[in-house]
């Protein structure tokens, strides 16, 4: 069973409406849409789809991330998705993305394997800033950028293995993101890396964490696929810039076809 999983927050609700409408129009092969958002603001969606909404309180702590503790908390929620659904698999997407054509969840399977997309670090451009945080988390030199696409397909089995590994090595996902990874943000680093010149004060990213875990420790369920073969019809935007009129026009026209 496959669910679609979205971690959002009130500032992204306007984007989420379009994301949900695009799923309704274009996506098949899943059971439920599972949404986790911050407590305090009710999320109301006008949709006939099967949607389950969970509310979580933000931790009452400060964090060195420039946008506050919500960024790290969202990563923790995404990597602990098994708390919110009993699905065997989930597709994670961000609320500011939007499908633009038909796709079935079977796309993410190839034979008896699941697809996880990557690119070489040499191909990552500005994404190279994630190399040192990835090396720090995985406790070895990473070889690939595992976050080049805007959709990510998780399995319960491998996620639970990942969670166990993080518990054993870092004391849990939230403990890693909120305690150990703080040094990545503050640049007060207590470890060595051959790529330290690429580090610009960015913390670990959840999909680099999971993708490198797959590559180094438990690749059994997955086939690593180069991003050049990525064919998901999706539009990725950046909600921090706000939803501009031209973007609204594009989305409305697409959904009306």
Whereabouts are the PLM-identified features?
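A glycosyltransferase accessory/donor-loop signature
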Residues: 175-257
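Nucleotide-sugar donor-binding/catalytic module of glycosyltransferases
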Residues: 4, 16, 74, 97-107, ...
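Conserved catalytic core of nucleotide-sugar-dependent glycosyltransferases
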Residues: 103-197
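N-terminal anchoring/stem segment of glycosyltransferases
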Residues: 1-61, 238-242
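Active-site-proximal specificity loops/subdomain of glycosyltransferases
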Residues: 44-84
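GT-A fold catalytic core of metal-dependent nucleotide-sugar glycosyltransferases
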Residues: 77-121
């Amino acid at each position: 069973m496959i669910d679609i999983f979205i971690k959002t927050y009130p500032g992204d609700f306007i984007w989420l409406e379009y994301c949900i409408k695009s799923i309704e129009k274009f996506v098949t092969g899943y059971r439920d849409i599972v949404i986790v958002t911050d407590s305090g603001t009710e999320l109301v969606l006008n949709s006939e789809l099967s949607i389950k909404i969970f509310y979580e309180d933000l931790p009452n702590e400060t964090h060195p991330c420039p946008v506050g503790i919500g960024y790290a908390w969202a990563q923790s929620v995404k990597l602990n998705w098994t708390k919110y659904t009993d699905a065997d698999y989930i597709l994670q997407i961000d609320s500011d993305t939007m499908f633009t054509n038909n796709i079935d969840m079977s796309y993410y399977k190839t034979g008896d394997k699941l697809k996880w997309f990557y690119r070489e670090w040499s191909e990552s451009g500005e994404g190279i800033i994630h190399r040192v945080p990835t090396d720090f988390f995985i406790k070895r030199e990473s070889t690939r950028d595992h976050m080049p696409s805007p959709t990510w397909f998780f399995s319960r089995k491998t996620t639970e293995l990942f969670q166990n590994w993080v518990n054993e090595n870092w004391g849990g996902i939230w403990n890693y993101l909120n305690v150990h990874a703080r040094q990545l943000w503050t640049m007060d680093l207590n470890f060595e890396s051959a790529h330290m010149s690429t580090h610009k004060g960015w913390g670990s990213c959840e999909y680099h964490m999971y993708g490198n875990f797959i590559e180094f420790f438990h690749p059994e369920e997955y086939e690593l696929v180069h991003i050049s073969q990525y064919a998901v019809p999706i539009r990725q935007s950046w909600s921090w810039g706000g939803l501009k009129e031209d973007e609204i026009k594009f989305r409305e026209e697409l959904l009306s076809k």
